[in-house]
Amino acid sequence: MTQYNTAMLPNGLRIIHRPSASPVVYCGYAVNAGTRDELSGEEGMAHFVEHMTFKGTEKRKALQILNCLERVGGDLNAFTGKEDTVYHAAILHEHTARAVDLLTDIVFNSTYPQADIDKEVEVICDEIDSYKDSPAEFIFDEFESMMYAGQPLGRDILGSAERLRQYTTADACRFARAHYQPDNAAFYVYGDVPFNQIVRTLNKLLPAATCGESVQNSAPTVSFAPPAERVVDKGTHQAHVLVGGPAYAGTAPRRFALIILNNMLGGPGMNSRLNLALREKAGLVYSVDSYLNTYPDTGFWNVYFGCDTHDVKRCRRLLERELCRFIDKPLTAAQLAAAKKQLCGQVGISTDASEGHALALGKTFAHYGLHRDIERIVSAINAVTADEVQRVAAEVYAPDRLTTLIYL
């Protein structure tokens, strides 16, 4: 069984460590502060604070932050999601202490200097424009805004240029004081470094970094908007289509049956039902993929494909046919066994992607207090029955629950 080490510091910071024989250490902070934690009038604030976190601390200027790991061949980066912001580093194990010190400093001691705000806001505005110019990416955000209309989960992570240009140092500090506290974060380490050394280092660094009381994250109850269909004229060369609907939260027992369904429907394998139907047999699309998007309290699924505009109706009919196949006809024992074997193999291989596994380690521990135990996941997958798969398909893939977004 895979070894994991966990601890909690007196200030509430949770730590998780997985040993590795690799000379590279992946580590970082997963802070429970994302788009859904923004108040009204704070749209885009979580992502704005992420950008400004690299602009200076009480003891480091921006250039010192950028050079700290780079000059020893390391990497420092961050990203913002709907429910978290993750600051992560990759470094040779002999430089682990340097990475831990830097990450702790920028997460808990950033000053968000006003002199850099105007410049960085324009960088984010360019990011917004670039994103809007990529319909195959932007469509996913608009689809989620349809699923969670009028709720924080439905907001765009990047915010709007108009709102961003109003933000000040005081706004960033207020958001950070509320959310960037040890008891609202988890520190993760994946690599060849002694666990007790990490705990000692963080115990030494963090008391001075703690500067307030974090807000207890109590996200409002989430509800799904009614099923809808929206067609948007984007003037693109091909149509971009998303079809999906409500699914399960990240802790729901039925999620494993849905994971099997999703993988069979449009997972990464070239033998997925949609790839065989839309690409291999009909030649209508270059790629078609099915996704599960889960949060601790909600979740949804969708299928994306791009095709010629005159093929949209035909592709949708083929998609609906495949959904109905899962609803109307139970999997045979051989089909279910093959699906489980393929999925378990993919799960196992995914752990070999070290940085991705490290990020998943941090995010899962931050939100669920659990580690991504491969043996436990495989056991849960193998326990799923054909009857359970069919019942989940009937609930999740029901035609009257589908929301559709089309860019033409």
Predicted regions span which residues?
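M16/MPP (pitrilysin/insulinase) zinc-metallopeptidase core fold and M16-derived inactive scaffolds
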Residues: 21, 28-90, 268-284
